Amino acid sequence: QDGDPVKGEAVFKKCMACHRIGPDAKNLVGPVLTGVVGRQAGVAPGFSYSALNHAAGEAGLHWTAENIMAYLPDPNAFLRKFVTDAGNPEAAKGSTKMVFKLPNEQERKDVVAYLKTFSN
């Protein structure tokens, strides 16, 4: 089943402890997520990323729907694997600031559908 952006908006409330989305959104503990689907990792303007996030972006990580789905259950494990698989295992250390995990697959599909409504 595909994601439902209306349900995704409700799921996104869990994310709002650290993130904002929309035309007037500002960075908080986490970066603004307006336009995140399709964006390169680690490049939201004005946000100070962890070294691990920077390494993933430099290794070519883009936030496709598939990558977001794979990231949300365990952000650190996903980023470390991406950086290692890209041939830079020495950069696959440290951690992202994102400690929240979203293990439920349908909730992830719904929140990705919601994020897509704010992306080109």
Swiss-Prot record:
Name the SUPFAM superfamilies on file: Cytochrome c
Q: Which residues bind heme c?
A: C15, C18, H19, M98
- Record's PROSITE patterns? CYTC
Q: Which PANTHER family match?
A: CYTOCHROME C
Q: What protein is this chain from?
A: Cytochrome c2 iso-1
Q: Which InterPro entries match?
A: Cyt_c-like_dom, Cyt_c-like_dom_sf, Cyt_c_1A/1B
- One MF term from GO for this chain? heme binding
For this protein, the record's Pfam families field holds: Cytochrom_C (PF00034)
Please outline how this chain is modified post-translation.
Binds 1 heme c group covalently per subunit.
Q: Which family does it belong to?
A: Belongs to the cytochrome c family.
Which controlled-vocabulary keywords does the entry list?
Answer: Electron transport, Heme, Iron, Metal-binding, Photosynthesis, Pyrrolidone carboxylic acid, Transport
Modified sites of kind Pyrrolidone carboxylic acid = Q1
